Amino acid sequence: MKKILFFAALFCSPCILSHLYAQSIQNTDWKAFIADPLNDTLIIHIRTDSSFVTNRNGEVLVRSSYTIAGDTLTILDYGTGDYVCPDMKGRYKFIRSGDNLAFTLIDDPCEGRAQTLNGSKWVKASK
C-alpha cells in the first residue's frame, strides 16, 4: 500500500507543481518603465486567460490572449491599436521571483512586443 501511495504521489507531483507554477502569474499586475520609443511606465494586467497593457494614465494599449505551459508564455494580441500585432504569436520564457518578473524571448515576429518584453524586468504592481 505504501508503494502505491508513493508512486501515486510521485506521478501526480509534476502535474500539481506544473499547475501551481502556471498559476503563479495569473491574476497579477506588473509594471516596468520602458524607454524609447515609449518613455512610459507600462502595467501588464494578467488575468485568467487574457491580459492587457496600460500606460501610466490607464489607457489600454494592447489586449492579448495567452497560454502558459511550464515556464513558457505564448501571447497573441487582438483588437486594434498602434501597438497591436494581430495574428502574430510570441513565445517567451518567464521567471517569477517573488515580486519580480522577467521575460526572455523564445520567438516573436512582433518586433515592438519583442523589444518591450525581451530582457525586461517587471515589478509586481500594487492594486
Where are these regions (language model features)?
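Bacterial Sec-dependent N-terminal signal peptides
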Residues: 1-25
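Short, flexible N-terminal segments of the mature chain
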Residues: 47-53
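N-terminal helix-cap/turn-to-beta initiation motif at the start of protein domains
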Residues: 17-31, 43-47, 119-127
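Sequence-pattern detector for short linear motifs
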Residues: 5-6, 99, 127
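Beta-sandwich strand segments
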Residues: 113-115
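Contiguous, well-ordered beta-strand patches that form the walls/edges
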Residues: 33-41, 53-110
